[in-house]
Amino acid sequence: ITLNSDTNRGVADDVVVEFLGVPVFYTPHHEWVLEGRGSGFLAPTFGRYSESDPSDINDSRLGDYKVRIPYYFNIAPDRDFLLTLNQLSSRGSVVEGKYRQLIANNKYLDKGRFEVEGHYLNEDDITNNKRWLLNSSIDLSINDKTELSLVTNRVSDKDYFKEIAHSDTSATALHSHIDLTYADEAQDLNMAVFAETEQLINSGSASYLRAPEVSISKVFEGMNDRKMDLSLVSTKFTHKEGNTTTKKTGLRTHLQANFTRPITTNAYSLTPKLNLSSTDYALDNTTNESRSIYSFGLDSKLFLEREASLFGTDLIQTLTPRLAYNY
């Protein structure tokens, strides 16, 4: 065994692992990192599968095998890359890669994280088609109030997970989205823009999409604890069955408004509340719909106190009856 602190590597030749004096493992050469992490091969994995039903790992007819050999690249403290060769006996060689990076504070961004993963099979030995997977994820804190999230998930065809990855065979869709949010706690203001798409897989049929959705909420506070809470959400939505629109699609706008004006004295408190909820549907190729709901509430309390004594100890006895009414 040789330990080299200058290269941060350990090397061992003719390694024999024994258990109770019995050799159980041998390797002619092995290297490892002394401190931290380093580049190198990771443990390979072996498995079997069946083309008749790739999702059934207990199928007694398992006649195909897969071997995954990963190599890890330690690029820098804030980034790395994993390269894997996935050999499928019935399909061919799949090259897989996964890159990760942390984004530190700079003049453009507060902080963030970036990740991208790709799989590629140049020619499927059975279908003669190119098969691929591409996933990415970006989370950015643009400043102390604004954040951005972007997620994409795509595959070459709906049977990729069943025939190539041999996983997620129960999933029916791959979702992708972009989400931009703004939150100002000092101003009680929140805004967001959201949009999503999806790819149907594994014979998936139903889908519901919001593309886009814009929301804003604001709290207004006045004198004597007056408060008005407003929330507005506008959503462009679609229902799809396969690639054909078969359900209602259109624009939904929802407005929520709450008004409160607490009145508090040493003897009592009254809190009237007025709520308004309105939803409007501007539907395509059909009659528009809308509904409005109004509600009123009154919450009242009495504060009753008196001096009392218990076993020679002076106490204050408090009784707070409460009556609430909602319509």
Label every model-predicted segment.
Residues 2-327:
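Outer-membrane beta-barrel proteins and related beta-barrel translocases across Gram-negative bacteria
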